[in-house]
Amino acid sequence: GWPAYPGRNGIRSSVCQKKLGCGWRKLASLPVCKAFCLARKRFWQKCGKNGSSGKGSKICKSVIAHTFEKAGKGLIKLTDMAVATIIKYAGKK
């Protein structure tokens, strides 16, 4: 099924960023976090509450919607790990 619509306020990039704790302590993940939240906002704007038909229908799949809703936290965690690793190796040279 189609995931619950986060609401007009819930799809806002700033709300999404706050929920994910973007840039809080970890500035490295901020650009990734912002990009994710913006993409998520655009997705919901295009697809609406129940996956609009029409121009956006190709991307308006429940699988994508669920992925967007679940990806946030994992994405930020991964970015932080990757950045930490890069910094670690960069420091060795």
From Swiss-Prot:
Gene Ontology cellular component annotations, sorted alphabetically: extracellular region
A Gene Ontology BP annotation from the UniProt entry: killing of cells of another organism
Similarity field: Belongs to the worm cytolysin family.
Name of the protein this chain belongs to: Parbolysin P1
Keywords for the protein's UniProt record, in alphabetical order: Cytolysis, Disulfide bond, Hemolysis, Secreted, Toxin
Organism: Parborlasia corrugatus (Antarctic nemertean worm)
Record-annotated disulphide pairs: 16-37, 22-33, 47-60
Function of the molecule: Cytolysin that shows hemolytic activity (on bovine erythrocytes, HC(50)=5.75 mg/ml). This hemolytic activity is completely inhibited by small unilamelar vesicles composed of PC/PG, PC/PI and PC/PS in 1:1 molar ratios (with at least 100 mg/ml concentration). The recombinant protein does not show hemolytic activity, suggesting that it is not properly folded or that it requires a free N-terminal end for its activity.
Entry keyword Iron: no
Subcellular localization(s) per the UniProt record: Secreted
Cytoplasm as UniProt keyword: no
GO molecular function: toxin activity
Tissue expression profile of the protein: Localized within the skin and proboscis and are most readily isolated from body mucus secretions.
